[in-house]
């Protein structure tokens, strides 16, 4: 199994090194990661700038290719020819923070895995909930990733499917397992913060409190709150099928 690994937190993120380490136990791994943090960049692609890539090392000293593009650029560049062959799976993460529910619309982590689908390669996005004490421990995430990717290797995934995996901030001993769940809803409480530079010109920050989570049964948010890792199948088709027939009944003539 040949696995392409990337992230959106940048090549020096400890989550990326932890992901590469566990996947190296399962298959052959190639890392192509961005040279900086692209959190919340979504599926941004650099269409009007050249891309550059060079050899480097991750935070644990393991080898990687570093790219000055976005997470999606890293995947496209790798599949289009930076690697010597097409990967069997694209895995993005381990993101330093949740990608639950509505977060997927913003997530560079998820977008990188989705870029694999554009090229016919199934994807896995991996994120870990931010620990309250700020001390990152990826062992539980590695347990969940190992179990899931071994099942993927055994059973396979269709090329149009992305799996979104979130892991709570727990130890391997207290992780209750993996629960398959649908996307939940997070309500963002953003605020516009206005400040002024020394010349009196305004500049802006978009800030705010933590999102309000709707912890409905069967959602990824509920699974995390119960101590499970959440696993959600995601597809590229964003069509609202419920509204297709309704819109067709509108008066178009």
Swiss-Prot record:
It is an enzyme of class 3 (hydrolase). Keywords: Cytoplasm, Hydrolase, Metal-binding, Nucleotide-binding. It holds the Pfam family SurE. Its cofactor is a divalent metal cation. It comes from the Bacteria. It comes from Chloroflexus aggregans (strain MD-66 / DSM 9485). It catalyses: a ribonucleoside 5'-phosphate + H2O = a ribonucleoside + phosphate. InterPro entries: SurE, SurE-like_Pase/nucleotidase, SurE-like_sf. Nucleotidase that shows phosphatase activity on nucleoside 5'-monophosphates. Binds 1 divalent metal cation per subunit. Belongs to the SurE nucleotidase family. GO terms for molecular function: 3'-nucleotidase activity; 5'-nucleotidase activity; exopolyphosphatase activity; metal ion binding; nucleotide binding. GO terms for cellular component: cytoplasm. This is 5'-nucleotidase SurE. It is found in: Cytoplasm.
